[in-house]
Amino acid sequence: MEPVPEEARGVGDDEGELDCLTHMIGALLLQKEPENPENGDSKETIWSGELEWEDAQILDQPKTLHTVQCKICSMVKEGQPEINTENWPNKLKTQLIPKKVLGKIGEQFLKDARMVVFRSSQGEVLNLLITAMSSGFAGCIHFPSNPNCNIKALILIYSRDHQALVGFIPNNEDSFSERLQEILQGAKRKPGVKTPKQPQPEEPPPVEEDAIINELLWTGSLNWSTQASLEEPSISHKLECSVYIAIKNGDPGISAEDWPTDMPMVLMPSIYLGQFAGAFIKDSKLIILRSTPGEEHDSLASSMSAGSCGCARFSSEVVCKVIMLLYSSPRNAFLGFIPRDQANFVKRLREVLDEHRQKARNKE
């Protein structure tokens, strides 16, 4: 397989959707796995063989080929696995592509997909792949043409929350494959070092390659508290930071003029967000929060890496009502999304919180 050149590391709406989905894979797709395999649906090994990939390199540098023995597990419903792998090859060749390229395809394909989990006991070799995927890459497995195999492509993403490689097989195979090829061909036309592009008469520049600019939206402090246990006092935190927004065609689509200088935030388990936020992420504005590395930055990053997300709530005088924040390790930055449908998002968030509070009271 030909390597795909890595694009410039800008932050766009599509990539933001993918990063958020990556962070919430466990909540959206893995949370229903029962602790006791004898209860409810279980996972069954449906394929065993070799997973092969090359180092993600730029330009014409030598590449190293890696191979790891692994197995693929799928959910079993009514005694039958969701995926039929009878005609799959014994070796799956994986192409590493930048998440930004994959994000342009559209996260609707990941939502309307079947899921599998890759497992391997060869930790040292597998860590090489995990490291690459934690650095801004995803895997794409192309299946050879076979009339007896109805699978054309599988997308592989690493879920840090559950320390697992999760594969997605889009249900709309034809549309996904066509869109993937369009994006890959567009990426190959973009060199690692950008130079002015001259539109060709027979091939005008694709719409998806419009420039994305990160514009400063707000500067202030983020305030939250943590508590190690109920017996210990809470600790207040304050992080000086700036919020940038990804804009196209010079229009940010949102104003922060009425945002307070001190932004209050509460931490909550990201699984709460994962129960309902997928539908809102697609219709949201993406922001990126940057701060100087330090004790407070590391404290918040540690909390979010351990399974928390941030919810910044504003007063009734502010047009924007809520911002959700997640931590992106590859960028060492906090990504946020502002739902366009603020009222319904806040309503659904309250419902989910009330449900969990009621469950907690019932256990007492």
UniProtKB/Swiss-Prot annotation:
InterPro entries: Med25_PTOV, Med25_PTOV_sf
Region named Disordered: 187-207
Pfam families associated with the record: Med25
Gene Ontology, cellular component aspect: mediator complex; transcription regulator complex
One record GO biological process: positive regulation of transcription by RNA polymerase II
Superkingdom of origin organism: Eukaryota
Family: Belongs to the Mediator complex subunit 25 family. PTOV1 subfamily.
UniProt-recorded name of the protein: Protein PTOV1 homolog
Organism this protein belongs to: Drosophila melanogaster
Lineage: Eukaryota, Metazoa, Ecdysozoa, Arthropoda, Hexapoda
